């Protein structure tokens, strides 16, 4: 698989090479002039940081303060490649019960997983396996504003996604108080870091939802508070570990803060970190198992994110449209640059990406294998085959299951799944 990816990348590079006397592209200028800037609330203008395995999407406050205002736009997700959940299966429905024989005139009967219209156990099985497992929203991290505060009260907004350094800088006013927020994602951990300066001393809330199991939404059910638990496992004056348990699924959230602050439980699945000073820096890491490594500081996270994204843009291919006279060139360049960033944070993971990346759920958070060409083949074209290679190992892992599907349907070789999940169920 690795050799194949490298060969394809080399082919693209060779065919794309032009005159060696072309002027050198100023890559930083190219990237920076296409960094998105937001100056007012727009439910379609949320911004994200991520690393391919994890992504965190923010509103105009640089955190996830007003998620309800973005639900019908681009929701404020916190998603990972490992964060999945299944509802209970008390009837012990099995994948075999979803199969139906079809005759396509090839001289044999072929078994396919089917969405049954007739009521009964087969329909129940098809419905259950369609929904389960589904991808989790790992938690809302935002300012703990007073109840009744509206997003329209946020004024003087200037927010920039600094693509070159991989950070979001947000400045705004709320109730007359100035706020400055810097948000980054660690390049190799499922963790965000934030630097906040404000005399308002507004707390940071950490809220944890139960999943909806819906086809396409933000995956947040805030009503089912008794169906899951969130507890503080350990806590000291500068850190805490939370454990979120949903049926048979559990994961951990490690909070570390710099500066005087207190962490308290405000309600079920609702915790608030309240700063005592004008400056608060914190990290929030999500893990599928109890944390066992030394926490990474905010400064370390910022530095590693900067180094990663600087290297990302300095390496691989680049295209500069600034000398083009066609009026469409500026917009085309913007899309070319921004799509590279979005696909790197949303689609460069150890499993194929869902159609909406790691922002919100579509098709229950599952992924469609016919779509991987659109999401990931471009990595080879841009000479970033290392990002493509992250996913190829998954194909090797599930190849035995794909071979069983082919055998079940009377074919040689393998038949890849269409809509599936990490375990290929």
For each predicted feature, which ranges?
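Detector for methionine-enriched segments
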Residues: 1, 191, 276, 371, ...
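Sec-dependent signal peptide recognition
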Residues: 2-7
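C-terminal motif of bacterial Sec signal peptides marking the signal peptidase cleavage site
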Residues: 15-16
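Acidic/polar, glycine-enriched structural segments that form the non-catalytic walls/loops
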Residues: 20-366, 384-388, 395-405
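Carbohydrate-binding/catalytic loop surfaces
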Residues: 356-366, 411-425
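Extended hydrophobic/aromatic segments used for targeting, binding, or gating
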Residues: 361-377
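Carboxylate/His-rich catalytic cores and anion/metal-binding grooves
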Residues: 372-417
């Amino acid at each position: 698989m690795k050799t194949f990816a490298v060969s394809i990348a080399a082919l693209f590079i060779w065919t794309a090479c032009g005159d060696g006397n072309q002027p050198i592209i100023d890559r930083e200028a190219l990237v920076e002039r296409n960094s998105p800037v937001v100056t007012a609330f727009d439910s379609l203008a949320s911004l994200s940081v991520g690393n391919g395995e994890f992504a965190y999407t923010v509103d105009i406050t640089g955190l996830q303060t007003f998620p309800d205002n973005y639900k019908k736009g681009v929701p404020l997700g916190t998603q990972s490649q490992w964060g999945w959940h299944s509802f209970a299966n008390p009837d012990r429905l099995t994948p075999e019960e979803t199969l139906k024989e079809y005759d396509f005139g090839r001289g044999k009967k072929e078994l396919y997983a089917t969405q049954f219209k007739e009521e009964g156990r087969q329909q129940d099985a098809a419905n259950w396996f369609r929904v389960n497992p589904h991808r989790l929203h790992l938690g809302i991290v935002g300012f703990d504003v007073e109840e009744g505060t509206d997003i329209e009260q946020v004024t003087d907004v200037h927010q920039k996604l600094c693509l070159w350094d991989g950070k979001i800088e947000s400045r705004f006013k709320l109730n007359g108080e100035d706020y400055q927020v810097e948000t980054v994602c660690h390049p190799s951990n499922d963790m965000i870091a934030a630097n906040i300066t404000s005399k308002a001393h507004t707390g940071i809330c950490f809220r944890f939802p139960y999943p909806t199991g819906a086809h396409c939404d933000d995956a947040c059910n805030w009503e089912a508070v008794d169906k899951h638990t969130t507890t503080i496992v350990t806590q000291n004056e500068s850190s805490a570990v939370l454990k979120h348990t949903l049926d048979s699924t559990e994961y951990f959230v490690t909070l570390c803060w710099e500066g005087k602050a207190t962490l308290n439980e405000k309600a079920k699945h609702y915790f608030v970190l309240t700063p005592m000073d004008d400056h608060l820096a914190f990290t929030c890491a999500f893990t599928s198992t109890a944390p066992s490594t030394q926490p990474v500081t905010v400064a370390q996270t910022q530095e590693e994110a900067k180094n990663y994204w600087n290297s990302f843009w300095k390496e691989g291919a680049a295209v500069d449209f600034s000398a083009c006279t066609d009026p469409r060139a500026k917009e085309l360049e913007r899309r070319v640059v921004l799509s590279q960033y979005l696909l790197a944070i949303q689609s460069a993971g150890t499993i194929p990406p869902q159609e909406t990346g790691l922002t919100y759920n579509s098709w229950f958070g599952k992924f469609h294998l016919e779509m991987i060409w659109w999401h990931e083949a471009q990595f080879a074209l841009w000479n970033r085959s290392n990002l493509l290679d992250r996913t190829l190992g998954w194909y090797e892992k599930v190849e035995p299951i794909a071979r069983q599907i082919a055998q079940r349907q009377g074919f040689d070789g393998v038949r890849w799944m269409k809509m599936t999940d990490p375990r290929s169920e």
